[in-house]
Amino acid sequence: MSVNADSQHSNNSSHQASEKAFDRARSLIPGGVNSPVRAFGSVGGTPPFITSAQGSTLHDVDGNSYVDLFCSWGPMIHGHAHPQIVEAVREAAGHGLSFGAPTTMEVDLVEEIDRRTSVEKARLVNSGTEATMSAIRLARGYTGRDKILKFEGCYHGHVDSLLVAAGSGVATFGLPDSPGITKAAAGDTVVVPYRDVQAVEDAFASHEGEIAAIIVEGAAGNMGTVNPRGFNAELQRIAHENGALLIVDEVMTGFRVSESGWYGKDGVAGDLTTFGKVVSGGLPAAAFGGKAEIMDHLAPVGPVYQAGTLSGNPVAVASGLASLKLADAAAYQTLDANADALAGILSDALTKASVAHHIQRAGSMLSVRFAEGEGANFADMKAADTFRYPAFFHAFLDHGVFAPPSVFETWFVSTALTGADFEKIAAAATPAAEAAAAATPSA
């Protein structure tokens, strides 16, 4: 879905500096952004160019302030510029930015990941994409098989084989995959509908002895939010019955929905698990881990090669450790309460405006489906009245609330949200719901 940029922003004068910055950026950076969904392609208009953020609030180059409800796409569970995290980063940077050698802090971070999850050993990398790419390679090396089974609408980073029928930014731009992905890469990817156990059984029957692993998000968050509702346990059973591994992608859910991620919700342990976002406190870092017997197939002790110049970067590791130290039981109670409050505000406003909707929930993650009833898969999420979202989004933005700029993205809350923030969200929700009600499908 594409929206004319000129059709949005009811108060263009308040975005003049962002418009100027965006024009300059487009002359130097493809699309003017370094990740496609930031370009507002599915909602139209000019993305605010952010200068700073504190707590629950983003500030842009025009002097506008916004309550943040996407939290840098997930990692900022404690809000922005938390003093303890900033101090940890400052202290680490003072000792050096990169060593290319082991540090005790990276061991500490992996130990904390292991303590909270089913992981026995883990390795640090630089992004969620790198984590899933490495987990896929390891699964293939360990099993001696080539094919990977994934689900329509689940996004696992921009790895070639995993962009087939992906969600997130790919869904935003209406692409089934991406040019540049070879037929061979696509051919090694088996895609079935999410939450369809029979389709998974049938795929293994059709590709007997060929599938190395199933990869699935802990809870789907890139087709909007879709709760697995027991699906992961079925995947674990099917994978193990067929000699395959289960890779649980917790880049989004890990340490966001509980102290132990989605594993803390359903108790389903992946043979391999990927982490990102919260694990880095907002800096570029991620991890993948799993059973020691599988992880020991990685070089230098095993034959599967994986490496990274900046992996285990001391500044990013310090940020991650500080973030996880703050992520205690009280923090998750606050996140859940804030998500409940947000969901209630959204639903109340849409109900009063007579807009058919369902608030999709997976722990403290949520999204709005503009149709009655829960969506269970990508087809359900696409079948809703997605045309209502651009008007809904921009009404919020014009009233100082920054929601995710795509109907297929998840809304995130932080512990930094205040009573005043919720008053602002509630005040914005009424015109946003009215705008959604008035929206019509484009020709």
Curated annotation (Swiss-Prot):
Its EC number is 5.4.3.8. It catalyses: (S)-4-amino-5-oxopentanoate = 5-aminolevulinate. Its cofactor is pyridoxal 5'-phosphate. Residues 1-16 have a biased composition (Low complexity). Keywords: Cytoplasm, Isomerase, Porphyrin biosynthesis, Pyridoxal phosphate. CDD domains: OAT_like. Pfam families: Aminotran_3. The modification N6-(pyridoxal phosphate)lysine is found at K277. Belongs to the class-III pyridoxal-phosphate-dependent aminotransferase family. HemL subfamily. PANTHER family: GLUTAMATE-1-SEMIALDEHYDE 2,1-AMINOMUTASE, GLUTAMATE-1-SEMIALDEHYDE 2,1-AMINOMUTASE 1, CHLOROPLASTIC-RELATED. This is Glutamate-1-semialdehyde 2,1-aminomutase. The gene is hemL.
